[in-house]
C-alpha cells in the first residue's frame, strides 16, 4: 500500500511539473486583431517576435473589414487591435458606448489616388467618378488628398476630420464621388477608373504605393494605432506593447520590409 501511495504521489508530481513547464513555455497569451495585408504582416513579423521575447504567446487574427476588429476587442475576444486611427476609434466608441483606448502610433501606409484610366493628375477629365471610403474619417482623408493634389478646394470652416461634399467650394474637374466600403476600393481602380485607396488595402491587393497618381500628406490623427480596452490601461500588457513598438527590433523590420510607410515624428 505504501508503495502505491509513493507511486501515485510521484505520478502527480510529474503531471504537475509538466503542467507548470507547459505554462511557462507558452507564457501569457495575447490575441491581436489586424486588418489583412500589411498590418497583419506588421503584427506577425515586427510585433509578435518582440512580444514572444517578452514571454508572451501571441495569436494574430486577421480581418477583412473595419467593423469586426473593434467589435471583437470590445467584446473581449481580442486583447488589442491594429488597423485604425484615433478618430475612427473615437467614432466607434461614441456609436457603441465602448471604451477603447489608443496607446501608441505605428508606421502607416498612406492613402493614394489610383487610376486605370489616367497616367497623371492633369489627364483626369471633367466629370470623372472617384471612389472613396464610406466612413467619414477616411473619406475626409480622401478629400484632403484631392485638395493637396489641386483637384478640389475645401472650405476653411470645414471640420477637417468630418469633411463632406458640402464643404467643397471648388471642384475644378467636376468630380463625382462614389462611397464604398474600404475593402472594395482596390477593385474600383478598374471598375470606376479613379479610386482613393487606403494604403493597407492597396498593399494587400498587391498595388504599389509608387503607382498612385498622388499620395496623402498624412495628418498625425490619421496614423494607425495599437488599441486596447480601457480596462487594460496601466496594465503590464499595455507597457509591453508600447515597449515592443519602440524597440530596435520592431523598427529594423519596419525599415527593411515596410518601405514607404509614414512613421510617427519621433521615429523619423
What are these regions (language model features)?
Residues 74-84, 128, 151, 172-176, ...:
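Alpha-to-beta junction loops
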Amino acid at each position: 500500500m505504501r508503495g502505491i501511495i509513493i507511486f501515485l504521489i510521484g505520478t502527480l508530481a510529474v503531471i504537475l511539473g509538466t503542467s507548470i513547464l507547459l505554462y511557462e513555455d507558452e507564457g501569457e497569451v495575447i490575441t491581436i486583431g489586424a486588418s489583412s495585408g500589411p498590418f497583419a504582416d506588421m503584427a506577425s513579423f515586427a510585433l509578435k517576435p518582440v512580444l514572444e521575447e517578452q514571454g508572451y504567446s501571441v495569436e494574430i487574427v486577421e480581418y477583412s473589414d473595419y467593423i469586426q476588429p473593434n467589435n471583437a476587442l470590445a467584446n473581449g475576444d481580442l486583447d488589442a487591435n491594429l488597423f485604425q486611427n484615433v478618430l475612427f476609434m473615437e467614432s466607434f466608441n461614441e456609436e457603441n458606448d465602448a471604451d477603447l483606448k489608443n496607446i501608441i502610433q505605428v508606421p502607416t501606409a498612406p492613402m493614394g489616388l489610383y487610376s486605370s484610366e489616367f497616367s497623371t493628375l492633369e489627364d483626369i477629365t471633367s466629370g470623372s467618378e472617384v471612389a472613396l471610403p464610406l466612413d467619414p474619417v477616411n473619406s475626409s482623408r480622401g478629400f484632403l488628398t484631392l485638395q493637396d493634389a489641386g483637384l478640389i478646394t475645401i472650405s476653411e470652416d470645414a471640420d477637417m476630420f468630418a469633411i463632406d461634399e458640402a464643404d467643397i467650394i471648388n471642384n475644378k474637374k467636376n468630380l463625382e464621388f462614389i462611397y464604398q466600403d474600404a475593402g472594395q476600393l482596390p477593385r474600383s481602380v478598374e471598375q470606376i477608373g479613379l479610386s482613393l485607396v487606403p494604403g493597407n488595402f492597396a498593399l494587400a491587393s498587391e498595388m504599389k504605393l509608387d503607382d498612385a497618381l498622388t499620395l496623402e500628406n498624412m495628418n498625425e490623427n490619421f496614423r494607425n494605432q495599437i488599441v486596447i480596452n480601457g480596462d487594460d490601461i496601466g496594465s503590464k500588457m499595455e507597457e509591453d506593447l508600447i515597449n515592443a513598438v519602440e524597440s530596435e527590433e520592431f523598427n529594423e523590420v519596419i525599415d527593411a520590409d515596410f518601405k514607404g510607410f509614414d512613421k510617427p515624428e519621433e521615429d523619423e
